[in-house]
Amino acid sequence: MGTIDTTGILAKHAIKIAEELCSPAIIVSGDFDLAGIETNIPIYYVPRRQKSIIDNLISDSLEDEKRLKSILEPMAREATGNTQHIEQAAAIEHIIGELRTGTIVGLIQTRESGAIVTHEVSQSPLIRTIQECEERVDPEVMRVALAIAFDIAASGREGHKIGTAFILGDTEEVLQRSHQMILNPYAGHKDEHRNLLDKKNWESVKEFALLDGVFVISEEGIVQAAGRYLDVDAKDIDIEQGLGGRHVSAAAITRDTFAIAVTISESGGTVRIYMDGKELLCLDYIERPSLQK
């Protein structure tokens, strides 16, 4: 009896499901080769997650029930982890503007199993967080700030990892509760050269992200200042232990004003969103998926 081509069967069914759903993309995690399958739907490949349930298998000496549990629990964790990996990749591509909303189809393979999953992009925690901030900051400004944050998290600047923060909205209050550490590089420039909605201005933001301090950005996306120091009382701010002063002060300014803060950690490139002094979302850096040509 011949060997069943499980990956090939899964791949063909994933394509069929995606076409029936009019999916904006198929996102693949694992050793699937879809090069020979014709479809007009964009196919993205995300890097494989490192941990596999085979690393969690135990010796035969344990009781069967415990042994089964020790296999099933890691399998459930891995399935959840791989699904979240695909969902996060889809959300980031949507934020960056490479992926429209809709139901994406994910194709997952590990050394032990394979699966097809579907995910509605608009229901992503990241997208819902942006919607939660809509009353305070224009959603497009929020999207652009996150796109720049992901870019900084991924590539840094001139080979160096960068940590910075964007304080969005309630500009007048934020400026009153902060001061310049250096000469404001945006002072005196026309709005058109400070507008984040114009992609031509993103490079200057990434350049000035090397400066100490934070960016202050209006709810309409106009950069008011860079290299700004926040004068806040960090007392009673409850954030993850081990985070530095930039994260503490960014969280504190959102407690004291109606601003939203987006932070990028220098170590690891983790992107966080704060509102009302609390962390709304934490996204660990993941390598962006590659588009199949």
Would you name each region that the model predicts?
Residues 2-252, 261-293:
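Divalent-cation
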